[in-house]
């Protein structure tokens, strides 16, 4: 229903059910199919953002400070989990000139660099804190990750989403 679209944890629960039905997880008791996700719902009238994450965190940059809002430690899909999901929601007052980022663990877990270690969250947050424009931030993270990865194989999906509110 439309009411549910303003509640990100409900959207994630609906997505979880859709994944289970589409992949027939209950029917085959398959446990290795699923995904991590995050959902933002924004009210311009109230300058309020609601966020719910399934193993995905939200990062908000305002005035060169990056703040982390943690998602819950549960993924969507996968048959071995509670039903319905017990997901929390963050209610965040926002101000103009804020930028928002969500990224997958495929980025942070990518092996590379001179020591062949994981890329890490710290590198991403450093780039986010240095840039003022979302487009430039995403471009810089993409280029830095590509350079860091070198000849190492990609381990997972690489998902990076950013937006701003002016």
Q: Which residue ranges define each predicted feature?
A:
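Conserved subregion of the PPM/PP2C metallophosphatase catalytic domain
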Residues: 1-166
């Amino acid at each position: 229903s439309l009411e549910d679209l303003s509640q990100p944890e409900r959207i994630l629960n609906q997505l979880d059910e859709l994944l289970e039905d589409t992949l027939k997880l209950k029917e085959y008791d398959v446990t290795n199919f699923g995904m991590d996700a995050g959902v933002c719902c924004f009210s311009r009238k109230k300058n309020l953002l609601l966020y719910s994450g399934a193993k995905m965190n939200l990062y908000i940059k305002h005035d060169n400070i990056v703040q982390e809002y943690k998602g819950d430690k549960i993924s969507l899909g996968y048959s071995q989990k509670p039903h319905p999901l017990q997901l929390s929601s963050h209610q965040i007052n926002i101000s103009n000139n804020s930028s928002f980022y969500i990224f997958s663990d495929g980025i942070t877990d990518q092996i590379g660099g001179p020591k062949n270690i994981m890329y890490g969250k710290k590198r991403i947050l450093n780039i986010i804190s240095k840039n003022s424009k979302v487009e430039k931030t995403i471009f810089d993270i993409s280029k830095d990750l590509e350079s860091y990865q070198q000849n190492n194989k990609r381990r997972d999906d690489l998902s990076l989403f950013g937006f701003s509110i002016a």
